[in-house]
Amino acid sequence: MHCERFLCILRIIGTTLFGVSLLLGITAAYIVGYQFIQTDNYYFSFGLYGAFLASHLIIQSLFAFLEHRKMKKSLETPIKLNKTVALCIAAYQEDPDYLRKCLQSVKRLTYPGIKVVMVIDGNSEDDLYMMDIFSEVMGRDKSATYIWKNNYHVKGPGETDESHKESSQHVTQLVLSNKSICTMQKWGGKREVMYTAFRALGRSVDYVQVCDSDTMLDPASSVEMVKVLEEDPMVGGVGGDVQILNKYDSWISFLSSVRYWMAFNIERACQSYFGCVQCISGPLGMYRNSLLHEFVEDWYNQEFMGSQCSFGDDRHLTNRVLSLGYATKYTARSKCLTETPIEYLRWLNQQTRWSKSYFREWLYNAMWFHKHHLWMTYEAVITGFFPFFLIATVIQLFYRGKIWNTLLFLLTVQLVGLIKSSFASCLRGNIVMVFMSLYSVLYMSSLLPAKMFAIATINKAGWGTSGRKTIVVNFIGLIPVSVWFTILLGGVIFTIYKESKKPFSESKQTVLIVGTLLYACYWVMLLTLYVVLINKCGRRKKGQQYDMVLDV
C-alpha cells in the first residue's frame, strides 16, 4: 500500500515537472526566436519554435496513422455479442425531420437486444411532438411513453417527498421493463436528461451508449464500440467517428465537416493510440456501466467556481473515466452523422460554449495526468497554450509596421493548412480534405477570439446553441470577433502609416507582388473548386433518403 502511494507521488512529481519543463521550453524557444533559416530583409525565416510545431504535427499524424492500422487489424476480431447494451438518447426541441431520421437509424442497429431510452428535456405541450414521433417510428405497441411532471432532482407543483419518490420509482420500473421507452420530464438541461437515463437503468446493463437526437447511427456502430470494450477490460469508454449530416447546407457546415474529420481521425486517433481520448463525443459514445455508477452523482453535481456546471457534459463524463485510471479509445469503424449549425452566429456560440468546457475540463484533467501516458500531459500543454502563442504572434506581426509581415502571416497560415489538409487527403483517400486549409482562416478570424472570450466568461452559462426546432439568434458571440478585428485593423493602419514614409525598393515591390498574386490565386482556385463541389454534390444529396450512414 505504501509502495503504491510512493509510486503515485513520484508519477505526480514526474508528470508535473515534464509539463512545466515543456511549457518553459516552448516559451523560451518562442521568446529567443532562434532562426535556422533566414533570408535577407527577413522575407522568410524558419526558427526553433516553428520547427517544434512542425515536429508536433508530424508526430501526431504518425501515431494517428498507426492507430488506424490497429483498427484495420481488429476488423476480423470475433466477439460474442452477449453483453447487454442500452442506448440513451437526449432530446431537446429537436427538428422533427432529424429526430425521425435518428430513430429510424436506431431501428436498424445490428446489435441484438439493444434497449432504447429517449429522455425529452421538457414536458410542455410544445414538446409532445417528439414523443409522438418516437411512438410512430418505434411502434406504439412495442414501446412505452411517460410524461413526468418533474425529474429526479426537482419536484412538481404541490408534490410531496413521498409522491416524488413514487414517480421516480415508476420511471425506473418503466425503463427496466420495456425495450423501448420515451419519457418527457421537467426541463433541466442535457445533464439532467442524461442523469435520468443513467439512474433509471441502474446496473441492469453492461454497456451504456449515448446519442443525441439529431444523430443518424450506422447499423454497425454499437457492435464496433462493444468490440473495443470487450478487447481490453481497462478501456472504460470509447467514441466513434462523427461526420456531418448537413454538410452541403452552407459554407459553415461544409468547413465543419472537414474539420470534424481532422479532429476525429487525426487528433483523437492519436490520443487513442495512447489510451487517453480527451472527449468522447455526445453523438456517438459508449461506457462501461459499472464505471458510470461509480461517479454518476459526482458527475451530475459538478461545480466550478461555486456554480453548478450546465455544459460540457460529455467532456466531463470522459474525464471521470480517465480519473479512475481507465483508458478511453476511439474507433473509426463506428460511425454516425450529426447536424451542425449552418448559420455563422449559431456556430460561433456553439464553439464558444465548447471552448468554455475545454478550458474548464483542462484544469480537471490535469489532476489525472499521472495516471496515464505522458502523451496526455504533452498534448494538454501544447493544445492548451497554443492559442496564446498564436495571438502574440499575430499581434507582433501586424504591429511591426512592415506590410510583408502581414502578407507572410497570411501565406503561412494557408501553407500550414494546405500541408495538413494534403496529408489528411492521402489518409482519407478523398481530395475534399484540401478544403481544410480554408478552415484555418475561420480559426484565425473567429475561433481564436472566441476562445479568449470563453476564458473571460468561463463561469457564465446563460447562452449557447439552442434547440433546432426554434433557432434563437444570439449576437453576443460577435463581441470578441469585433474586438479582434479592431485590433488587427489597428495593425494594418499602423503598417500603412509606417510604410508610406519611405518608398518600396524594387526587390521589395517584386516580393510583395509575387506574394499577393500567390495568395489571390490560392483563394480563386479553392473557391472555384468549392463552387463546383457544392453544385455537383449538394444537388445530389437533396431529397436523398439514406438507408445507411455510410451512403452519405
Curated annotation (Swiss-Prot):
Localisation: Cell membrane; Endoplasmic reticulum membrane; Vesicle; Golgi apparatus membrane
Pfam families assigned: Glyco_tranf_2_3
Residue spans crossing the bilayer: 12-32, 46-66, 375-395, 403-423, 430-450, 476-496, 511-531
SUPFAM superfamilies given in the database record: Nucleotide-diphospho-sugar transferases
Cross-link (Glycyl lysine isopeptide (Lys-Gly) (interchain with G-Cter in ubiquitin)): K190
One CC-aspect GO term: plasma membrane
Glycosylation sites recorded in the entry for this protein: S221
Tagged with keyword Cell inner membrane: no
E.C. number(s) listed in UniProt: 2.4.1.212
A GO BP entry: endocardial cushion to mesenchymal transition
PTM annotation, UniProt: Phosphorylation at Thr-328 is essential for hyaluronan synthase activity.
Membrane-topology annotation of the record: Multi-pass membrane protein
Cofactor(s) it depends on: Mg(2+)
Name of the protein in its database record: Hyaluronan synthase 2
Source organism per UniProt: Bos taurus (Bovine)
